Amino acid sequence: MPQFAAQIGSRDGFSDELLHYVDSDGVEYFTVKATGQSGMSPSGLAKLLGVEQAQISRWVNRVQQADPLNNSLPKCLKSFAGHDPNFSAYFDIEKRNILSDSFCVAIIKYYASYSNRANKESQAKAQQTLYSITQIGMRVFIHEKTRWMEA
């Protein structure tokens, strides 16, 4: 039943199952209320990196069509080969997909480290974003290990 519920829009046009945030640059973030599963819209990820949304869409298609065992994907994207990086049951009322947080990180890593085609500004944005994610990720990792919770 969560798939059906996730497809019903609320008054703001997004599923009642999702938390939705848009930052000042128009980057969209989503979290599934019940599970904490997080992700971004393809257009939001593109804005975050300073690239065209078509570039993100090409990577989505490329990983979906890639053979899981034999492909030429960059190392950071290989684990997604043959899989759909979108949330399978959650999308907004316009039926736009939401990319999983792990795929978003892989794309950010690609633009920060592997892409020869990214312009210097996009690469710098990706590197700064990756650094921020790493810092936050390490903090959350340690919090989980020490069982720290905000009071």
Report residues per predicted region.
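Positively charged, aromatic-accented nucleic-acid-binding surfaces
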Residues: 1-55, 61-151
